[in-house]
């Protein structure tokens, strides 16, 4: 199985100080992984804004992760109106699940609130 990472999986997989890093790091090992520009941008925004990490370090760690894990990139090539979230809090997650489905992937997430058949909740 090939997986599209959501923003939280990417953050937890990269930042060693994150409480979820150990479980994310263990799950990610040996998996066939993909990301898309939306996820990359979300990682950068949260890492630099919420976590307060410096931009150069944030970008460097992302590049190291992508290279070491041999993560492939997929295009954000699904029109936004082709996903159909029911409320505003579902917009990005539902889009990523639909994007994963379009590319024959599963969306890997720790978020149990995403209701979509292309989602694999990691525990």
Question: Can you say where each PLM-predicted feature lies in the sequence?
Answer:
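Alpha-helix C-terminal capping segments
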Residues: 24-31, 100, 113-116
């Amino acid at each position: 199985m090939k997986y599209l990472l959501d923003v939280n999986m990417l953050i937890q997989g990269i930042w060693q100080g994150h409480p979820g890093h150990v479980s994310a790091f263990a799950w990610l090992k040996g998996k066939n992984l993909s990301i898309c520009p939306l996820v990359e941008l979300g990682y950068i925004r949260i890492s630099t804004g919420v976590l307060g990490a410096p931009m150069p370090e944030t970008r460097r760690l992302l590049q190291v992760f992508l290279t070491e894990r041999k993560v492939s990139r997929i295009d954000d090539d699904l029109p936004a109106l082709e996903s159909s979230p029911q409320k505003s809090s579902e917009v990005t997650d539902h889009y990523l699940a639909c994007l994963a489905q379009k590319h024959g992937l599963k969306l890997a997430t720790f978020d149990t609130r995403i209701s979509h058949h292309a989602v694999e909740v990691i525990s």
